[in-house]
């Protein structure tokens, strides 16, 4: 629900500011799961949705967006510096639709809309605090927009200033280098989707982290397949990176500490990739014996 609650906060914020009129359109650029959340919220509240997504994302996520009646626009996967990057493309499209759609349109802009971070500061963080009875020593997760990590960090640090906040970063992202050396620099690549940021978004502004880890695809997949085999949980790549990061943080802090992370994506949305023998073989990645 991390993406669904952010989607709802973004829409409610736009309503409160008078930016979103009845029957209006919500436009967003997303690697998938926020798009699904926005499409769901739009349908439930009587709005239209146009979702811009890199064509490299899994077919299952594209199908889920269409199931909620949203219009899906697929674009090439290019860096943020390119004007045709899915995020920047969606911003221009929102401007065009705002002028042409009779009921207007807004750009959700999850990366730089701090209503995203606020959703987690007001809901996710306090829920973690309550569910652990305040006995949380560390929180760690990956970053896409940064809303979850920054919002939860804000909430937990308000309750316990010495709580340890960690970043789990896939290869190909630049935040591990930023939080360890001060330089935004990426290395390698990853099959993970929707995480791995190359810039400091508005949601990340002001965030400091105590621990940062770089997680390889091999380490991520080992965790994902272990969750299936030993916990009966079929999860996606972001969850794999998150849990791998939590294991690293737990080892660093030592026994007796409570570490929290987020299991945020269903494996069913990645069947064509991380649960696909042909895809894994093509990428030279490990294949579980049961697949």
PLM region spans:
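PLP-dependent amino-acid enzyme catalytic core
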Residues: 1-291
């Amino acid at each position: 629900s991390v993406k669904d609650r952010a989607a709802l906060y973004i829409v409610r914020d736009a309503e409160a500011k008078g930016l979103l009129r009845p029957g209006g359109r919500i436009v967003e650029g997303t690697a998938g799961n926020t798009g699904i959340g926005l499409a769901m919220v739009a349908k439930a509240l009587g709005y239209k949705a146009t979702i811009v997504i890199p064509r490299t994302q899994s077919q299952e996520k594209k199908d889920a967006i269409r199931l909620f009646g949203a219009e899906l626009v697929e674009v090439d996967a290019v860096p943020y510096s390119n004007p045709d990057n899915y995020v920047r493309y969606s911003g221009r499209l929102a401007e065009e639709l705002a002028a042409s759609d009779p009921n207007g349109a807004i750009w959700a802009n999850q990366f730089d809309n701090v209503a995203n971070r606020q959703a987690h500061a007001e809901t996710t963080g306090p829920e973690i605090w309550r569910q652990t009875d305040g006995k949380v020593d560390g929180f760690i997760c990956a970053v896409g927009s940064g809303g979850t990590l920054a919002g939860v960090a804000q909430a937990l640090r308000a309750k316990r200033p010495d709580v340890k906040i960690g970043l789990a970063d896939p290869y190909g992202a630049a935040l591990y280098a930023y939080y360890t050396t001060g330089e935004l620099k990426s290395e390698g690549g990853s099959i993970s989707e929707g995480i791995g940021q190359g810039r400091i978004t508005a949601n990340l502004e002001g965030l400091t982290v105590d621990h940062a880890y770089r997680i390889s695809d091999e380490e991520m997949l080992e965790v994902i397949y272990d969750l299936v085999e030993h916990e009966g949980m079929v999860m996606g790549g972001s969850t794999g990176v998150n849990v791998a990061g939590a294991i690293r943080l737990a080892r660093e802090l030592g026994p007796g500490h409570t570490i929290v992370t987020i299991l945020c994506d269903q494996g069913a949305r990645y069947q064509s990739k991380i649960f696909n023998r042909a895809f894994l073989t093509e990428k030279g990645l490990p294949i579980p014996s049961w697949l």
